[in-house]
Amino acid sequence: MVLGPEQKMSDDSVSGDHGESASLGNINPAYSNPSLSQSPGDSEEYFATYFNEKISIPEEEYSCFSFRKLWAFTGPGFLMSIAYLDPGNIESDLQSGAVAGFKLLWILLLATLVGLLLQRLAARLGVVTGLHLAEVCHRQYPKVPRVILWLMVELAIIGSDMQEVIGSAIAINLLSVGRIPLWGGVLITIADTFVFLFLDKYGLRKLEAFFGFLITIMALTFGYEYVTVKPSQSQVLKGMFVPSCSGCRTPQIEQAVGIVGAVIMPHNMYLHSALVKSRQVNRNNKQEVREANKYFFIESCIALFVSFIINVFVVSVFAEAFFGKTNEQVVEVCTNTSSPHAGLFPKDNSTLAVDIYKGGVVLGCYFGPAALYIWAVGILAAGQSSTMTGTYSGQFVMEGFLNLKWSRFARVVLTRSIAIIPTLLVAVFQDVEHLTGMNDFLNVLQSLQLPFALIPILTFTSLRPVMSDFANGLGWRIAGGILVLIICSINMYFVVVYVRDLGHVALYVVAAVVSVAYLGFVFYLGWQCLIALGMSFLDCGHTCHLGLTAQPELYLLNTMDADSLVSR
């Protein structure tokens, strides 16, 4: 049965707990109102994370564009763009250059553009509703799917955190010329994270400026490597704008798939939808909402353009200097330059395989110690900035899905402990190759979690009761559905290839069992999404006891007043 706006619901329904029902909730009359219901600032005062300070937007006469307003909206997009520059992305970039040369730059460009479109949806959800993605999921999905979804997103955040720990530990090891062991670098990342998290006590704009400083460090360090190596500009442009991959075989194809998985991060959708709430926007005023959407999109374009250029620096450096190189050639150069790392590479004619650690070493062998240390500084900046945004993502997700407020200190202790323990064990009992090899597994993990961000964001931004006049149009719904399907398919291929290479029967059995459960849940989310996109014939109504209405625009959002959100 579908409840009308006039019907009252139980306390459990208001809190978002629908028991074991498989369906989403019913419509919230606040969202069905064509005028956006929430006034600026209401129902948001209980948020403690990141929102202790609101940035006001300057009042100006109506104009098509204002630099003052763009500056006021600048911040969330650059914090979001950090996920496009984390150590996992940097490793994917350098491997892409070493394995395929410049041939996959167009894949990087395409993945970044797709990421921009998805970030646009995330930002619009936060601006229009005043709720971030985790909060909307908490209010709309039944209890069991909601908990599973939360666990999947938490897994993605922890996996990302492990990549950041690995990157920072390797950077510290390189900067100390090996004096600080990898396990020591892992421990150092615990302390520095807490130090950086206290920066937001000094004001939101100062925190955003610090992130801008870290992005600048990455641009300068990786830009230095680009200028030093002097890659062919014609090859860079050809690789970027000519979509071809002549001579590409399985390693190059797998690397292309890996680029997509590394660039589009699941937790980033949750992060961006929350960060945009830090600006004062009167959601009763459609013009202000439309203006906020416009400036946030412009800022996201600028931020992702910067991140794309930095990624191009890394790909181009390794494409120019190390594409087609063999281990024997590298050993010879490292020996001639008296590098202490010459023994890191086998003396054979196999193609050079690089990672974050070996990448710094070969740069030092070919272009001098300065190139190695500057590379390490860039990796350290990538690891530290990603650590901080990952912590915010975890806090938003936990508060939104569980309706539970934790202090940042407690949140960091929990997440970082889970990420540190396996990383520390590998750092202590194995070598750097095993530590950097964890990145491959973690990239697979991130790929597996993508549907749990992409499907919900497309579902909710396509529903008029949620987004009012700002819901996705038919073109966006079709394009979004196709993009989500393609991205999920690409990443599933990446996972299948990884599992195939494991080569152990027991692991195949485990993978098969997990895959059945995984695909079943993805099917459930996809089914709900298709109904939201307008395919009401998929709603089997009362015959399946799912409680969905045949009218897709009326089946979402619980009957509760938007101003009476659950206190945390």
From Swiss-Prot:
Biased composition range(s): Basic and acidic residues: 8-20
Outcome, altering T351A: Abolishes N-glycosylation. Does not affect endosome targeting. Impairs sorting to the apical membrane
GO molecular function: cadmium ion binding; cadmium ion transmembrane transporter activity; cobalt ion transmembrane transporter activity; copper ion transmembrane transporter activity; ferrous iron transmembrane transporter activity; inorganic cation transmembrane transporter activity; iron ion transmembrane transporter activity; lead ion transmembrane transporter activity
Tissue: Ubiquitously expressed. Expressed in erythroid progenitors.
Activity dependence on pH, as recorded: Optimum pH is 5.5-6.5 for Fe(2+) uptake.
One Gene Ontology cellular component annotation held by this UniProt entry: lysosomal membrane
GO BP of this protein: cadmium ion transmembrane transport; cellular response to oxidative stress; cobalt ion transport; copper ion transport; dendrite morphogenesis; detection of oxygen; erythrocyte development; heme biosynthetic process
Coiled coil residues, start to end: none
Biased composition (Polar residues): 23-40
Region annotation Disordered: where it falls in the sequence: 1-40
InterPro entries: NRAMP_fam
Subunit structure of this chain's protein: Forms a complex with NDFIP1 and NEDD4L, in cortical neurons, in response to iron and cobalt exposure; this interaction leads to SLC11A2 ubiquitination by NEDD4L and proteasome-dependent degradation. Interacts with NDFIP1, NDFIP2 and WWP2; this interaction leads to SLC11A2 ubiquitination by WWP2 and subsequent proteasome-dependent degradation. Interacts with COX2 and TOM6 at the outer mitochondrion membrane. Interacts with ARRDC1; this interaction regulates the incorporation of SLC11A2 into extracellular vesicles through an ubiquitination-dependent mechanism.
Function: Proton-coupled metal ion symporter operating with a proton to metal ion stoichiometry of 1:1. Selectively transports various divalent metal cations, in decreasing affinity: Cd(2+) > Fe(2+) > Co(2+), Mn(2+) >> Zn(2+), Ni(2+), VO(2+). Essential for maintenance of iron homeostasis by modulating intestinal absorption of dietary Fe(2+) and TF-associated endosomal Fe(2+) transport in erythroid precursors and other cells. Enables Fe(2+) and Mn(2+) ion entry into mitochondria, and is thus expected to promote mitochondrial heme synthesis, iron-sulfur cluster biogenesis and antioxidant defense.
The name this protein goes by in its record: Natural resistance-associated macrophage protein 2
Organism (species): Homo sapiens (Human)
Source lineage: Eukaryota, Metazoa, Chordata, Craniata, Vertebrata
